[in-house]
Amino acid sequence: MFNAWSKDNGVPTFGYDANSDAVAAIAEGYGGTISQHADVQAYLTLRVLRNALDGVDVDTGIGTADDAGNVLSSDVYVYKEDERSYYSLNVAVTADNYKDFTDSTVVWEPVSKQLDASAHPTKKVWLNIYNASDNFLSSTYQPLLQKYDDLLNLDVEYIGGDGQTESNITNRLGNPGQYDAFAINMVKTDNAASYTALLNQ
């Protein structure tokens, strides 16, 4: 309703997530949106796992090129040493560059090269997304993960939660021993024990 009014009155509308509808609206005279660089987010999620499984430096394929030539430039991510965390950096989507964001599930070209299976054998990963009904997570983030898992030789089992209860997710982690790695996206950030208790069995 607000978007219709703002369009009729020539008032720019600003959004977040750079979902396809928000990007498409820019071509119709809306203001702009912000991309969370989901392509880089998804890559970092699985790249950190791949590096741990390979026993290589954590920065491999991120700030330092890997053996396939995958590397990120410093303007799309940041590493915070005190948090031991990588973050993708937001980017403004405007009338000048919106065409680059019309498909939010395209992998980031600088990190789109296939890893060699002999040097990086397939590993099995359990990965959950806390809310399968979330538009950004289900229509952008997970499709990107599914493209990168092939490039990184990861056999990922995806578990979608209900966004409400941890047990909806943990009940589907019945045999942790069959996986090589885990990527856990908690419903509540103080519920880590729900997962570590299962992994310690």
Q: Language-model segments: which ranges?
A:
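Structured segments of extracytoplasmic/periplasmic soluble domains
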Residues: 4-5, 25, 29, 48-56, ...
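Short beta-strand elements at the ligand-binding edges of bilobed clamshell
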Residues: 28-39
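Hydrophobic alpha-helical
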Residues: 1-24, 46, 145, 182, ...
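Hinge/cleft segment of the Venus flytrap/periplasmic-binding protein
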Residues: 44, 48-123
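Structural detector of well-ordered beta-strand residues that form the stable sheet scaffold
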Residues: 12-14, 34-35, 93
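A generic structural signal for alpha->beta connector loops
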Residues: 10-11, 30, 89, 151-155
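Extracytoplasmic "Venus flytrap"
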Residues: 123-144, 148-151, 156-179, 183-192
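Short, solvent-exposed loop/turn elements at domain surfaces
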Residues: 23, 98-104, 134-139
